[in-house]
Amino acid sequence: MGKKKSDSASGGAIPEGDYEKGKKIFKQRCEQCHVVNSLQTKTGPTLNGVIGRQSGQVAGFDYSAANKNKGVVWDRQTLFEYLADPKKYIPGTKSYSFFQMVFAGLKKADERADLIKFIEVDAAKKPSAYAHHLP
């Protein structure tokens, strides 16, 4: 039983999340486009340091205008909402000048919380400039 944080969008609470389950979700659903342990970008921007960062702000990544202009600061709450339906949260996210974002979201609250827990922990670590994959 983990702590829960407020989920004002649904009136419930965001589950604390499970790091190991989140790591598995990241490998299955996110790692093909994102890294957390490096400053390098892949098809998607690095998620290293994402907590507390404003959307559309990774240097060298070609964001859509919608993502640049959203102005959201990523935290547990905003990630929880975004991960449920990225295209609804930031309309226009799907098109970064050279690829189409295919991630449709995670509908289960527990899966979103697990993924956020993993991202919170690993994205806060000092990045390796040459790391490309999870350990």
Swiss-Prot record:
- A single Pfam family it belongs to is Cytochrom_C
- Molecular function as annotated in GO: electron transfer activity; heme binding; metal ion binding
* Annotated heme c binding sites: C30, C33, H34, M101
Its main subcellular localisation, reduced to a broad class, is mitochondrion
Keywords recorded for this protein, A-Z:
Electron transport, Heme, Iron, Metal-binding, Mitochondrion, Respiratory chain, Transport
User: InterPro entries, from UniProt?
Assistant: Cyt_c-like_dom (IPR009056), Cyt_c-like_dom_sf (IPR036909), Cyt_c_1A/1B (IPR002327)
Gene Ontology cellular component? Answer: mitochondrial intermembrane space
Task: Give the transmembrane ranges.
Answer: none
Gene Ontology terms describing biological process: mitochondrial electron transport, cytochrome c to oxygen; mitochondrial electron transport, ubiquinol to cytochrome c
Spell out the subcellular localization from the entry: Mitochondrion intermembrane space
Q: Known SUPFAM superfamilies for this protein?
A: Cytochrome c
- On the tree of life, the source organism's domain of life is Eukaryota
Q: What does this protein do?
A: Electron carrier protein. The oxidized form of the cytochrome c heme group can accept an electron from the heme group of the cytochrome c1 subunit of cytochrome reductase. Cytochrome c then transfers this electron to the cytochrome oxidase complex, the final protein carrier in the mitochondrial electron-transport chain.
Supply the name of the protein. Probable cytochrome c 2.2
